[in-house]
Each structure stands twice: as structure tokens, then as C-alpha cells.
Amino acid sequence: SDISGRAGFGARLGAYLLDFVLYGFVLAIPVIAGALVILVPIASNCVSVPGSDEIVCPPGVPSGSSVAGGVALIVLGILGVIFIYVRAEGKTGQTWGRKIVGVKVVRVADGQPPGFWRAFGRELFGNVISGQILYLGYLWMIWDRDRQTWHDKVAGTIVVKV
């Protein structure tokens, strides 16, 4: 099949690395906030025991609510970033990194963006399966005549130049 419009390995890797950095910065906000909600009460109320590695905290520090609140911030942050990422891929075929590099994900059948649930399945499969065996599922596009990764094949998508 004609692969002239398909994105190559370098462009896809570049987009992936940009996404990793850009979405990572966004994710850092709730992760840091959540960690602070948990750690500030410890830092301000607990003391180290001289001559040992032990730290002594007053009863209730950290409180269950501060730990729960911090964990909730972190979990909601992770879910929020996943939603933003998958929504962008599903709606336009482009994440921030793909937009910068000039590539997008489209359905093989009609060349349209994949839609939310197909994008979600593609990313889930990609993150869970494609990277498990020496990243073979990602590298597969180097040898594949259609330049598809395993998760592209499962989702019925290709990555094209814009």
C-alpha cells in the first residue's frame, strides 16, 4: 500500500517525547499539590529523634483527611491528563506533541479522527501491551508495510503527516 503520507518513526518518536514532556508538566501540578497536602503537615508538626532515623509525629499527623485529599488530587490529576490527552487524540487526531511535529492519528477506514473511545482503546493497548516486550509493539511500525504499530492495528488507525 502507499505509505507516502504516513508518518515515519522519527516523527512519531518526536511527538511521543514532546507529549511526555508537555503533558508531564501539566501532570506535575496536581502531583506536587497532592504531595504538599500530605507532606506539609508532617514537615510542620513532626520532629526527628536526635541520634536516630526515627521521626515522631503527634497523634493524627498526618491526618487521614490530608492523606486522602493528597491522594485524591494526584489520582484526579492523572485521570484529568489522560482525559485531556485522549479527548484531543479522539477529536482531532492530534495531541500537543503531534500538533508540533505535524502528524495526526486517523481511522484507516475513512481518514477521520478516531473518536474518543477508539483513541482510548488505542492508548490503553499501546501503553499496556505495545511497550511490554522490548517496545516491540511500538517498533513494529519500522517493519510494517503500512507503518502501523500494534495499537494502530488493533484500533484500525494510522498516523499521517499533516
Regions inferred by a protein language model and the residue ranges of each:
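Helix-coil boundary and N-terminal low-complexity module in membrane systems
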Residues: 1-24, 46-57
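Juxtamembrane cytosolic face of transmembrane helices
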Residues: 4-16, 20, 82-102, 113, ...
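Membrane-helix interface segments in multi-pass membrane proteins
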Residues: 27-78
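Membrane-interfacial segments
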Residues: 34-46, 91-92, 96, 100, ...
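Short, acidic, Ser/Thr-enriched surface-loop or helix-capping motifs
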Residues: 107-109
